[in-house]
Structures are given as C-alpha cells and as structure tokens.
C-alpha cells in the first residue's frame, strides 16, 4: 500500500489536475469562473498542512521529497482530487442566488470529502507515509481514530464552506471578470482556512480540554 501511495502522490495530480481543470471549465463555460473551484482546495491544502507540519508539528510526511516535515507538492495532491470529486456533486450553475440549493450542494460535497479523505488518511497513517501527533494518536489510537481528531473540520467542514461558497458566488461570478474571480478565490480560501481551524480548536477543547495545537507522543 505504501508503494501505491508513493506513486499516487506524483502521478495523481498529473492526471487528476488536467481532468479537474477540463471538468470545471466545461461546467462554467470559461476559465474565469472556474478558478475558485480549482484553486481554493490547493490553497487550503498548502496553508493548513504546512502550518500543521512545520509550525505546530502536529503532522509529518514520510516521503522522499520534503520541506521540513511537509511535502511541497501536497497542495496539488489534495487540490486536484478534491476539485474533481466536488465537480459532479456541485449541481448546475445557479443563475440567481438560491441558499437552499447552495446548502444542499455544501452538504453533499462536505460528506463525500469527509468520507474519502478520512479513508485516505487512515490508509496513509497505516502505511507510514503520514504521521500524526494528535491527542488520540498520543493515547495509542489506531489510524481511523487518530485521524478523527481533525478530519471533520479540515475535510468535512472545509467541503461545506468550499461548495457552499462557490454556489453562493456563482451568480456574481458569471460576470465578475478575472479580478472578481481572484477576490472570490482569496476570500473563500481564507474562510475555509480560518473557520475549519477555529472549528478544530473548538472541538479539541470540547473533547480534550485544550486547543490540540501541541504535538503528542513522538517516536524516539
């Protein structure tokens, strides 16, 4: 399994990235409104894990190519797959604001991303390509439980914000131009990062009584 994950981390983005770009451009009819759908997962997957690995020491990648504890291509590994997974779930572009449709899309994408990424991280933890030092991991939990400390905010809630934000922005994005798409991309990425991170801290306080921002037991 480790060998397959090692191959996927390089081959996956090379295949899934162009497929995701083609799918979203076809979905919206041009590159400009497709940019937030393609770039927000990449930005999220660079900022959150980079801080979690090299600043807080909560995660670590055991790969040949690393910057500190972080693999420099991780944003594209997560981002390309996430954009492609979300594409068939998002629904037809909205010509006018429709909060109910946005919520339905948000829940669909959030639940699927939670399930897929929880399974992926559990396999990655079991194979050793990913290491986590969450409170559950420090207590000797297995891969699924160790990943449970962070998967809901950083995958599930991220998917809700990402998809819901895209749907709410669609009517405006249709005529906003490149500057508008850039604004939506940055604003939505910031919302995903800040809200999911705050949710992780809040959940850790509820379960463990602390922020969950200090690494637990490490291998000697």
Regions found by a protein language model. Name each.
Residues 1-220:
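Aromatic-rich, lipid-facing transmembrane alpha helices and their immediate juxtamembrane interface loops
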